[in-house]
Amino acid sequence: VIGVKNSSMPVQDIQTFASLGGDDHIVFNGPDEQFLGGRLMGAGAGIGGTYGAMPELFLKLNQLIAEKDLETARALQFAINGIIGVLTSAHGNMYGVIKEVLRINEGLELGSVRSPLTPVTEADQEVVQKAASLIREVKERFL
């Protein structure tokens, strides 16, 4: 084992794992909502469920961290968190919402989620549209 994904919310756990593992081990940040905090506390990278909906935003966030532009990084993390809040607000599963967002924003026909995940409902379409729009707006602002 050369690495671990930390999915707990306390970023101190990342610092602990990074300290114990040393330079020949890697810690991955799990919670997308704290990518910035996790990276600053020692995560070498991240593994996240929402990255697929907005990969350019997480790549930009990682770039801002490398450039030590923490003010802009914080603003982008806050904007990403707003998107995540919308992605998780539907009746359908977040991954179903992401598939619909990718259909709208990228023209990708990915189908629905499989059982036991709950598919997006007709009532969720407002949430899907809002998430897709927010991602486009945040890309325009930061990219």
Locate the predicted segments by residue.
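Catalytic alpha/beta core domains of metabolic enzymes, predominantly
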Residues: 1-81, 87, 91
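Short glycine-/small-residue-rich flexible loop motifs, especially phosphate/cofactor-binding loops
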Residues: 35, 99, 129
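Conserved short secondary-structure transition element at the edge of the structured enzyme core
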Residues: 39-43, 81-115
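Flexible C-terminal active-site loop/helix
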Residues: 107-142
